Amino acid sequence: MKRVLNWMVLVLLLAGCSKPAPPPAASAEPEALSRTEFTKRVENFFEYEPLHSGKPSQVRIHLTDLSDGSPVENAVVTLGVRRTGSADSVVQTTSRVGKVTGIYVAELNVPSPGNYDIEFHIKNDKLDERMPLSNFKVE
């Protein structure tokens, strides 16, 4: 009996000496924000990295033509950024066409923190849509 008790104590001591599991590694990339907005002709689902002044943020834009449900092809997609309540554009950028039809990628670099509005202008042979959106916070 004494021998069994000694073995149990030894096993418990050895188990207590093991290292705890390391914490999971922190994600290097910030979590993307997303929104879905509509006009009468276009669905715009877009994802973007949190906006920080002076740092570029990628915007991934997924466009669908609501007249037939197809991806919006060969469009020029321009994003105009202005301070909330102002008519003057602070930044304007044109997206590049993504690898998949209907997906476009833009990079925004807003120079100073504050509240902003972004207007998406989507233009191709079939569409010429403007989509003014608000409630973008730049930190």
What are these model-derived regions, one by one?
Residues 1-16:
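Sec-dependent bacterial lipoprotein signal peptides
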Residues 16-139:
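Intrinsically disordered, low-complexity terminal tails/loops enriched in metal-binding residues
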